[in-house]
């Protein structure tokens, strides 16, 4: 696709099933993410979020090319390049402008992981993959190392068929998690998830949580997945490791990280979600495991 997306699909607007969301919330698996308890109706019924919604277009873009840099960095691969929220929104707005130039009555809102919208579920309905045992969307070609973006519009479309779940009996992702965060039915206990603890949890890492070297995010269950091992290698230039992030990683490794290094790296990176003191706390917690 000209704008750089590797896949897209369309789903008819409707009401999503809420059983998994209810189970996740009722068990407290959302940890301190209290915002997940709000706007539940909007998460389930897209028309409460976008009243004119008729079609949800889902788009995927792969970052399956920077695993070498991520492997020993302690930073999840998705965070090594530009901030995907900003990059994908620009692409979607460019696409929207193109469509509206041809169809002036085309109305749409675009979303990139920033609203009460269940991106993975809509991507499944759009035929772009299935939900793996680790809760991630798995695409048959690109695996689960993809970013998801959505455009919700007032036009109807030809709709895609859902794919069958192809995880089979594999439990590699479940068995790989050092903290046993992966529960049945693709549900994640955030309290025990390295990604949650190093990003969303603003406090210190609790005792008993093993980071295995990670200081921002985690790729352990993704690396274990057989679909990622055979996924097509593709990485958009936007998501190639930036010099600032590579410098940050070097400074973390040699113990010389300073706030100015962090500030330079966070300007265009997803790591802006954490404060400097939180990253230092994560580094100390990870280091304490090997001391």
Residue ranges and their predicted role:
Residues 1-166:
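Auxiliary alpha/beta "docking" domains used to position bulky ligands
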Residues 13, 172-195, 201, 211-238:
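Iron-sulfur cluster-binding cysteine motifs and their immediate structural context
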Residues 81, 103, 202-208:
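Generic structural signal for alpha-helix starts
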Residues 90, 146, 188, 216, ...:
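Conserved active-site and cofactor/substrate-binding residues in soluble primary-metabolism enzymes
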Residues 116, 194, 240-244:
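A short beta-strand-loop-alpha-helix capping motif that often carries His-Thr
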Residues 138-162, 187-207, 259-263:
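Short, charged low-complexity linear segments at domain edges
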Residues 169:
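SIR2/sirtuin NAD+-dependent deacylase catalytic core
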Residues 207-291:
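Alpha-helical scaffold domains
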């Amino acid at each position: 696709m000209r704008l750089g997306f590797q896949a897209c699909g369309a789903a008819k607007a409707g009401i999503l099933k809420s059983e998994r969301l209810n189970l996740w919330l009722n068990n407290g698996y959302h940890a301190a993410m209290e915002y997940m308890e709000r706007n539940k109706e909007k998460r389930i019924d897209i028309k409460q979020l976008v009243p004119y919604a008729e079609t949800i277009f889902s788009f995927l873009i792969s970052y399956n090319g920077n695993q070498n840099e991520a492997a020993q960095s302690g930073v999840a691969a998705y965070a090594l390049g530009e901030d995907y929220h900003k990059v994908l929104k620009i692409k979607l707005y460019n696409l929207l402008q193109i469509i509206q130039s041809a169809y002036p009555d085309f109305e749409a809102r675009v979303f990139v992981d920033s609203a009460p919208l269940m991106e993975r579920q809509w991507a499944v309905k759009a035929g772009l993959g299935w939900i793996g045992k680790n809760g991630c969307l798995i695409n048959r070609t690109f695996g689960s190392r993809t970013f998801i973006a959505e455009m919700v519009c007032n036009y109807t479309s030809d709709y895609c068929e859902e794919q069958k779940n192809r995880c089979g009996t594999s439990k590699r992702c479940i068995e790989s998690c050092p903290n046993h965060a992966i529960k049945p039915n693709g549900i994640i206990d955030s309290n025990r998830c390295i990604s949650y603890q190093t990003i969303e949890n603003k406090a210190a890492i609790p005792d008993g949580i093993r980071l295995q070297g990670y200081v921002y995010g985690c790729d352990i269950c993704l690396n274990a997945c057989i679909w990622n091992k055979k996924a097509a290698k593709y990485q958009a230039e936007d998501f190639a490791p930036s010099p600032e992030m590579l410098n940050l990683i070097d400074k973390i490794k040699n113990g010389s990280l300073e706030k100015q290094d962090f500030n330079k790296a966070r300007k265009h990176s997803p790591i802006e979600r954490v404060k400097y003191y939180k990253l230092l706390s994560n580094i100390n917690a990870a280091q304490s495991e090997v001391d």
